[in-house]
Design a protein with these regions (language model features):
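A short, Gly/Thr-enriched small/hydrophobic beta-strand-prone motif that recurs across taxa
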Residues: 91-106
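Functionally constrained cores in energy, signaling, and assembly domains
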Residues: 8, 85-87, 104-105, 117
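Short, low-complexity, polar/charged sequence segments that are solvent-exposed and flexible
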Residues: 64-65, 108-110
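Generic structural detector for well-ordered beta-strands
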Residues: 33-35, 76-78, 88-90, 101, ...
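Tryptophan-paired
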Residues: 2-56, 109-138
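Structured interaction patches on ligand/partner-binding surfaces of diverse proteins
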Residues: 23-28, 50-88
Length: 138
């Protein structure tokens, strides 16, 4: 991964109270530090090797000029007056993932199959975790 974004949304907030962007050149890459207020928070994590990233907190999207491996997690945390410490968060792959469901019988001698995508997605809505910015197949 070359980039990590961490966005903190306190419960009910429409804009993040904190945005952290780390690159792999940063000494603390992969170990972001947040100071969270008491209450419930949605903390969104996005890690990617994508190029030409643009973050838009109004539309809750992160788009790329070229998408490569990308991982994501919507992490909910409840902070009390006595909460502190670190959390380990495991991100889920969300880009360059393919799930093929084949309902037809596969011939015994079949060794490969071809897939032709109808659209490429160049972004993620980090609140829903869904892809955005679809364009025609390349």
């Amino acid at each position: 991964m070359t980039d990590l974004w961490v966005l903190d949304y306190p419960n009910g907030a429409t804009q993040p109270s904190a945005v952290i962007h780390q690159t792999s050149d940063d000494e603390d890459f992969g170990s972001p530090t947040l100071n969270l207020s008491v209450g419930s928070h949605h903390v969104y994590f996005i890690a990617s090797r994508g190029q030409g990233a643009t973050l838009d907190t109004e539309s809750h999207t992160l788009t790329f000029s070229r998408v490569l491996d990308t991982f994501y997690k919507d992490y909910t945390i409840d902070v009390t007056g006595t909460s502190n410490g670190s959390r380990t968060v495991t991100l889920d792959r969300c880009v360059t993932k393919l799930t093929a469901v084949i309902t037809d019988e596969i011939p015994t001698g079949a060794a490969t199959f071809n897939i032709t995508p109808t659209a490429w997605h160049y972004g993620i809505d980090y609140v829903s975790g869904n892809p955005t910015a679809a364009t025609a197949s390349q």
